[in-house]
Amino acid sequence: MDEFQRNENKHRSWQQFFLYPLFFREDLYAIAHDHHLDRSGSSEPTEILVSHFFSFLTVKRSIRRIRKQNNSISLLRNCDRNQFSECKKNXCSKSLLEGLTVVLEVSFAMRSKHFIEGMDGWNSIRSIHCIFPLMEDKLTHSNYISDIRVPYSIHPEILVRIFRRWIRDTPSLHLLRSILHEWQNSFSRDNLQKAIITPRENTRFSLFLWNSYVHECESFLVPLVKRFFNSQSLLYGSFPDRTHFDKKMKHIVILXXRQISTKKIWLLKDSFMHYVRYGERSLIALKGTHLEVKKWRYHLFHFWQYYFHLWFQPYRIRSLELSKTYSSFLGYFLHVKMRPLVVRAKMLDNLFITDLITNELKLIAPIRSILFFLAKEKFCDISGWPISKLSWTSLSDDDILDRFDRIWINLFHYYSGSMNQDGLYHIKYILLLSCAKTLACKHKTTIRVVREQLGSELFTKSFSKEREFISSSFSKNRLKRERIWNSEISQINPLANFWQNMQNKQIEN
C-alpha cells in the first residue's frame, strides 16, 4: 500500500477510476488480516501473522469464484456455503470485508486530505480533552446553540451516491452496492442502525462507512453555516463600551424608526459560529438574533433532506438559547449566565462608571443521574445510601480497592471542570463507604474493623493522585475561580455516556 500513497497527485485519478482490480490482490487481504499493522502509515508489515482459522487458500478460491461469476454478491453469501447471517461471523468473510475496506480507505484518505487543505482553519481530528476548553472559550460569546444528532438509519443507495462523488469506477460501485444491499437484507429492521453505520461499531468496514458518511455531512454543513452567517453580518470590532453602543443604536431606532429599518440594525451584530462533534452528537454555537437562528434551522432541515434524500426527524435538531435553557453534551449540563459588572474609570478629575455584562459558562455534572447509575450498579440504594457490592466479594482485597479506585479516578478526572464539586465529593463518600462495606461483607466483620485494619489504604491511590493533581499547579483559592481540564481524558466517561443516552431517549419521546 506504500505504492498507492506515493505520488498522490500523479496516481490520484488512477485510484479513483481503477479501484476494482485492487479488490483481487491477495496481498491486500494479508495486510487487512495482520493485527500488528504499523499505524504510523507504513502499510507493508514486516511479518504476516496468520492465525489457525484463517487460510489464504480460501481467499484465493473466493477471488477466483468472483472472477468466474457475474454476481459479485457471492463474495459474502457463498463463503462457506452458509447464509450471510452465519458467514458474517466467519473469519473468511471478515477478512474479505477488511480487504475491501483497505482499498477504499486509500482513496478516501486522498480525498479527505485535499478537502481539508481547501478549507482554511478547518481541523476535523482533535482529541476529546480539547473540546472542554473550546466550549469554555467560545460558548461564552454565543447566545444560541443548535443541538444536532446525525441520522444514521439510511438506505444503502444513499451511501452509494456518497461514494459516487469521489469513486468513478463503475465496477467498484456495483460491488459496493451489492455488499451494502446484502448487508441490509441480513439484519432485521430493528438492528439496522447498529449493523450498517454507527460510531459504536468496532468492525473496520462499519467504521469506514460511518466516517465516510460523517465526512460528507461535515463537508457541506460547516461551509454552509459559514456562508449563511458571514453573508448577514458586518463586523464592527470589539468595543470596550459595547453595551452603551448597543443602547445608543436602539435609541436611534426608537427616534427614527421610519427612516432606519431593523434589518440594517441587525447588520451591526457580529454573527459567528463554532462547530464541535463527538460521535453522532454535534453542537453549533451561534451568535445572532432569534430570527436568524430560526431561518438557519429551517434551511438546514430542508437542505439536509434534499441533499441526502433522507427524512430528517424534527427532534434531531434543536435550537436552544443558552441564557434561558440548559443543554446536555458529553455528560455535562451547559448554561451561559450573564454577570453584570460595574467598572469605575478615573481620568484626571472625572470619575466614570460603566456597566459591563460578561458571560460565564456553567458546566454542571449530573449528580442525580450519577447516583441513579450507582444505584443501578448496586453501589447504593435509590436514596443514595451506600451498600456493599456483593458481586465483588469473591475478589481479592487489592482487586476490590483497585476497582473502586478506578471508578473514582475516572469520575474525578472527567468532571474536574464542573462547578458543582461538592456533589462529586458526595459521590466519593458513597464509593468510599461502599468499598468499606464490601470488604466488611467479604470478611464477615464490621466497617469499624475494616477501617482500623486498612486505615488510610482505602482509596490511597485516588487521594494521592488527587492531591498531586491539585497542588502541583493551583492553590485552593484559585481552584474556586478557575477550572482544571485534565488532559488524560481520551473518551467519554461510561457514567456520562449512560446519562447522555437517557437524555436522548427523553428527547425522542
Curated annotation (Swiss-Prot):
Subcellular location per the Swiss-Prot or TrEMBL entry: Plastid, Chloroplast
GO biological process: mRNA processing; RNA splicing; tRNA processing
Alphabetized InterPro entries for the sequence: Domain_X, Maturase_MatK, Maturase_MatK_N
Record has Plastid as a keyword: yes
Keyword tags: Chloroplast, mRNA processing, Plastid, RNA-binding, tRNA processing
Domain of life: Eukaryota
Record's GO cellular component terms: chloroplast
Family annotation (Pfam families): Intron_maturas2, MatK_N
One annotated GO molecular function: RNA binding
Keyword flag Plastid: yes
Residue ranges of coiled coil: none
Record family assignment: Belongs to the intron maturase 2 family. MatK subfamily.
Family matches, as HAMAP family: MatK
Function as written in the Swiss-Prot or TrEMBL entry: Usually encoded in the trnK tRNA gene intron. Probably assists in splicing its own and other chloroplast group II introns.
Designated name of the protein: Maturase K
Top-level taxonomy: Eukaryota, Viridiplantae, Streptophyta, Embryophyta, Tracheophyta
Encoding gene (name): matK
